[in-house]
């Protein structure tokens, strides 16, 4: 009799390849892990590469609570051309000589797009407008507007400015940039808006996500590597990286698992999700403080 395969619970940090949707990666991981219970936290455009956080088995319950509010990217912005999608995947809709744009002007434009800003997401995106994905409306040629949304760009740095010539002969500038931003920020839209501010248009030509919340690229594995050896971050380790920790004694652990709302120390008030750990180091549950007591968000013990 063969031993039944058991997929470990935990997070898988994937280095997503270009050309794959986030759903493609989930489908691939279901085959690798031999389970249907795989989900992802946050998405990456098909063109982009880098960190995509997946949850396997019980860890799928963790995904919705992960404090993945801050993300970090490396990318390339081309000044001098606009595209339909604000990235290199879309059709070029305008070209303008960008060779006279100065570094001072670029830095001033970047400064305007830093900090707490209102951003209009790209029209070719998954945002729903009256229940319909905006990319579907865009593909059908609809004329519509997406309301601006508040986002935070903690850091927007330009490392290099390179002269280049586009395929149609237009002199353009390629900027190598890094961005640290809140969840929901469109790097494509930053490229578009920087180009608009400089009067020459702009779009994103390359993007690599290097961090999502506490999970960095150095912990990520390619799909080929995961096919060879499935590397899963145990739930307890994943929770320790993402949430404040509350250690409880054996009695409190038992009460918590039986649904009793325990009194929580004041230090956890207003801190969002908190990981509860028993004396043996087992991750029991995610809770949040509500009127001084622990409200269960997800139970793992």
Swiss-Prot record:
Record NCBIfam families: TruB (TIGR00431)
TM segment ranges: none
Catalytic machinery residues: 45
Catalytic reaction equation(s): uridine(55) in tRNA = pseudouridine(55) in tRNA
UniProt name for this protein: tRNA pseudouridine synthase B
Family (UniProt): Belongs to the pseudouridine synthase TruB family. Type 1 subfamily.
One BP term from GO: tRNA pseudouridine synthesis
InterPro entries: PsdUridine_synth_cat_dom_sf, PsdUridine_synth_N, PUA-like_sf, PUA_sf, tRNA_psdUridine_synth_fam2_C, tRNA_psdUridine_synth_TruB, TruB_C
Keyword Isomerase: yes
Reported function: Responsible for synthesis of pseudouridine from uracil-55 in the psi GC loop of transfer RNAs.
Gene responsible for this protein: truB
């Amino acid at each position: 009799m063969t031993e039944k395969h058991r997929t470990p619970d935990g997070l898988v940090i994937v280095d997503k390849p270009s050309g794959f949707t986030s759903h493609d990666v989930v489908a691939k991981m279901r085959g690798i892990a031999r389970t249907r219970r795989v989900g992802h936290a946050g998405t990456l455009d098909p063109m982009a590469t880098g960190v995509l956080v997946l949850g396997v088995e019980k860890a799928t319950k963790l995904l919705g609570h992960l404090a993945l509010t801050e993300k970090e990217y490396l990318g390339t912005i081309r000044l001098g051309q606009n595209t339909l999608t604000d990235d290199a995947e879309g059709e070029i809709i305008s070209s303008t000589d960008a060779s006279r744009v100065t570094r001072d002007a670029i830095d001033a434009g970047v400064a305007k797009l830093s900090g707490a800003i209102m951003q209009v997401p790209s029209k070719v995106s998954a945002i729903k407008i009256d229940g319909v994905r905006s990319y579907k409306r865009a593909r059908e040629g609809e004329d519509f507007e997406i309301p601006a949304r508040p986002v935070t760009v903690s850091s927007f740095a330009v490392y290099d400015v390179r002269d280049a010539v586009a395929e149609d002969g237009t002199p353009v500038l390629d900027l190598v940039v890094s961005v640290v931003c809140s969840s929901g920020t469109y790097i494509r839209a930053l490229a578009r808006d920087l180009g608009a501010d400089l009067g020459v248009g702009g779009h994103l030509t390359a993007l690599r996500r290097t961090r999502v919340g506490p999970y960095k690229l150095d912990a990520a594995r390619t799909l080929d590597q995961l096919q060879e050896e499935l590397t899963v971050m145990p739930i307890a380790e994943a929770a320790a990286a993402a949430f404040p920790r509350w250690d409880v004694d054996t009695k409190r652990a038992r009460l918590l698992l039986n649904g009793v709302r325990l009194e929580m120390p004041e230090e956890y008030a207003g801190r969002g999700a908190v990981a509860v750990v028993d004396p043996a180091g087992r991750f029991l549950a995610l809770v949040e403080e509500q009127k001084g007591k622990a409200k269960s968000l997800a139970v793992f013990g």
